[in-house]
Amino acid sequence: MNPSPTTVLFLSTGDAARGILAEALLRHKGGERFTAYSAGYCMLQEIAPQALALLNKDGVDTSGLYPKGWKDFFESPRSILVDVIVTLSEEARAHCPQWPGDPVRVHWPVDDPLAATDADERESKFLKCYDIMQNRVDALIKQRAPHSPAELMLQLRSIASVV
């Protein structure tokens, strides 16, 4: 019998770029070992078109992706218990509430590509963000299944430096 998948929630500021990229990539590459979600503390109304374009270019399924607020995960009838919370922005890290089930928390900082002021800079930042997310998701998938929450925390912290 296969163990239940590790449920990972990626938290960012608006859930329109970084979190969406991480969620989609882990869903695409993680197989049955992982269940991925993303949310923002200050949810935006739509996914950044650059994020969707990068995912689509690589054949990553984007159906069902949309910006979500993190309160949807623990203040609603459909609340989901998560095993791991990965904050992707300083804002998400600072505002992250206490989570039901006491999940492992780790911070994987990534610059916000939506903060870029012109089109060329934005494209460059999106490409860099996408590459970092791909590399970190790949590193996560390559980890062997941890034997304890402490071991999981060490694995996740080591991935934070992957660029």
Describe the residue ranges of each PLM region.
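Short polar/charged helix/loop
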Residues: 1-163
